[in-house]
A protein has these predicted regions:
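Feature targets compositionally biased, intrinsically disordered low-complexity regions
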Residues: 42, 90, 314-316
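Surface-exposed loop-to-helix/strand elements on domain peripheries
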Residues: 243-246, 269-320
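A short mid-domain helix/strand-loop element embedded in enzyme catalytic domains
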Residues: 230-234, 261-279
């Protein structure tokens, strides 16, 4: 029997699949409404704060993102602690190191990447925007791709507000709201830079530092409101005007105007026979109570953000 000869197959060169062209369109388009806020911190109560957190736990972080933004604006101590964390990163030097220092191709790639980063305007601002994740749990920037002499290059990197993103209630996937698809839109590959910071274990919507210190912010806010009201009542002596039993309405009106003028100008005139008395109040113990409570809240914020209170203020302190 003749045996059929098997043909020996020649090895074929395997061609790498072409890389997909980067999407040069702007996906997470900044909307005019992004700069506006519902200001959820106005009239904030424990009940409202819990409601905002429940919405974020369900995937909708819009009101939580707006609240966190206001917290940084309204609390100078909180702002300074977060800036300390961010400046510790932006102040560092960075270097692009080739994967293989002996491979000329790797050196060429490293030099290209370094030139790209150096050519991006405001690169430190971009890093600062991404470090916003420390407080809010995540931060997103969109890469605007372009072409230059046959190379795909980074034309710009634009920060996107956290309230444009959400977690899907069905599969918990991270999605972005766009002008075309306000309900759901998947994040595209190599298009968005997402920095997720985990101050603690759990879902990213609950992992930011500001989620931890929000209650201290609320209690301090109550304390400051009461302190301001206290200062308005007891911050200056009570001006008590006295008039004679037979004083006319014009005399009474003149006395009242004199009392008001003394409050603004520390001077006034009034008819002869009337008297103005200044009644001093001693409420130092209440003042100390407000100050101690506000300082306590600041110390807890410092511990949560920096891990200590020693370097937070010019005075003494202790490590947490």
């Amino acid at each position: 029997m003749s045996k059929s000869k098997r043909k020996r197959q020649q090895p074929q060169a395997v061609r790498a699949a072409p890389l997909p062209r980067p999407d040069s369109r702007e996906i997470a388009v900044a909307h005019v409404s992004d700069k506006y806020s519902e200001y959820p911190s106005n009239g904030l109560t424990p009940v409202r704060l819990a409601e905002i957190f429940k919405e974020a736990d369900a995937g909708d972080v819009l009101r939580q993102a707006e609240l966190f933004e206001e917290m940084e604006e309204k609390d100078p101590h909180l702002f300074s602690q977060l800036q300390t964390r961010k400046n510790a990163v932006t102040g560092l030097d960075y270097e692009i190191i080739p994967f293989d220092s002996d491979d000329p191709r790797d050196k060429e790639i490293a030099e290209f990447v370094e030139a790209q980063l150096g050519g991006i305007e405001g690169f430190e601002d971009i890093m600062l925007d991404l470090l916003d994740a420390i407080g809010k749990g995540f931060a997103v920037s969109e890469i605007m791709w372009s072409y230059d002499e046959g190379h795909v290059v980074v034309g710009d990197i634009r920060s996107r507000h956290q309230k444009r993103f959400f977690w899907d209630s069905v599969d918990d996937s991270f999605k972005v709201r766009t002008q075309e698809h306000l309900a759901r839109n998947e994040l595209r590959t190599n298009k968005l830079t997402v920095h997720k910071y985990k101050a603690r274990s759990g879902h990213p919507s609950r992992a930011g530092v500001l989620r931890v210190v929000a209650w201290m912010y609320l209690f301090k806010n109550y304390t400051l409101k009461d302190w301001v009201a206290f200062c308005e009542v007891f911050g200056m002596p009570l001006r008590l005007g006295k008039y004679q039993p037979g004083a006319s309405e014009d005399d009474k009106r003149a006395l009242m105007q004199a009392l008001v003028a003394i409050g603004a100008d520390a001077a006034g005139i009034f008819p002869d026979g009337t008297a103005i008395e200044f009644v001093n109040t001693e409420k130092t113990s209440s003042t100390d109570l407000y100050e101690r409570l506000a300082r306590y809240c600041d110390e807890q914020v410092s511990k949560a953000i920096l891990g200590q209170t020693l370097t937070s203020d010019s005075g003494g302190g202790s490590y947490a």
